[in-house]
């Protein structure tokens, strides 16, 4: 940064402190990652100046010939990555991508079947405090109380009973592979559309280390950050028959001008995801998650569903008589960032919770491997088994610092 320190030292200071925080702490929040310098450079480019309402070749402003190139690159790269017939890269977020699908196929009050938020779903899958739960009649499905795996018999039974117009698959805190073929089978049985929200697993899908929902779903939504390792934003993939409706739902339906600098960053990230080294990265993300899960179990922690198939895991802290809120706070004090998270059938409120959610996408980007997963689990065990012990916390801080110094981040 050459201009910001002089132009606005207060904003620069806050950004610099955040850069130092990201370097000094171990990032285990499952929805976060570290983008490349190229992605950041694209997002900070002159494209931030350009208004471009509409779509490539059909804009409502002049001077769009170069941003058209950028948006076409993003769309074509996404099609290639996921095997989609049509892609819209303009959604500002995953929530707006979901909203656009709802506006495409639903009317106010229509019935939708979605995953219970406390069982691993998302706010936009029907939470009563979200527009989705306010605008539509959401019926919830969840996980088996014993296995904590999606109960597909329950999904089928509720689909038959309520005859939803749309079924939503996908989650924000579900550590197992979702059977997309089973969901499509159920949707076809009751005449429903199927939407898959793959925001958390998109990078794993792109790399071929997780099943691809595109062949099964009428609509697939995603964020472009998380495991896809791009800028914060959204994207919709759909069958060609819905292309015009989806594009119209985004613009002029729920958005005006697209963020062309962000779309440029999406194009860069999608280009990165097409490379062989991204496939290696995604494979390591899953390997690290499985290793971390096993190491935490060796430390005596209980994992929801007994482990993980993707990049995230949920830890049930009730055996340790801890809340997620307490664990999040004390781990942050030693330099490990996680988030408190509800677990299935959680007796605590969403502001307290009985669990924490942990992900390996960011630490894998940083270069952490299997040995580091063992050490992270040991540090978490040290801290959560000795809450209130300053000696234990100080030891944990030193061990965290040793790891972060070994794998520097954004230091040049």
UniProtKB/Swiss-Prot annotation:
Name listed for the protein in its UniProt record: Serine hydroxymethyltransferase
The keyword NAD is annotated on this UniProt entry: no
Ranges in a coiled coil: none
Residues found modified as N6-(pyridoxal phosphate)lysine: 226
GO molecular function, one term: glycine hydroxymethyltransferase activity
Stored Pfam families: SHMT
Leading EC class: transferase
EC number in record: 2.1.2.1
Catalytic activity: (6R)-5,10-methylene-5,6,7,8-tetrahydrofolate + glycine + H2O = (6S)-5,6,7,8-tetrahydrofolate + L-serine
GO biological process, one term: tetrahydrofolate interconversion
Family that this chain belongs to: Belongs to the SHMT family.
Metabolic or biological pathway: One-carbon metabolism; tetrahydrofolate interconversion; Amino-acid biosynthesis; glycine biosynthesis; glycine from L-serine: step 1/1
Sequence positions that bind (6S)-5,6,7,8-tetrahydrofolate: 117, 121-123, 349-351
Record's keyword terms, sorted: Amino-acid biosynthesis, Cytoplasm, One-carbon metabolism, Pyridoxal phosphate, Transferase
Site label Plays an important role in substrate specificity, positions: 225
Localization (cell): Cytoplasm
Keyword Ribonucleoprotein: no
HAMAP family, per the entry: SHMT (MF_00051)
SUPFAM superfamilies: PLP-dependent transferases (SSF53383)
GO cellular component labels: cytosol
Quaternary context: Homodimer.
Obligatory cofactor(s): pyridoxal 5'-phosphate
Gene name tied to this protein: glyA
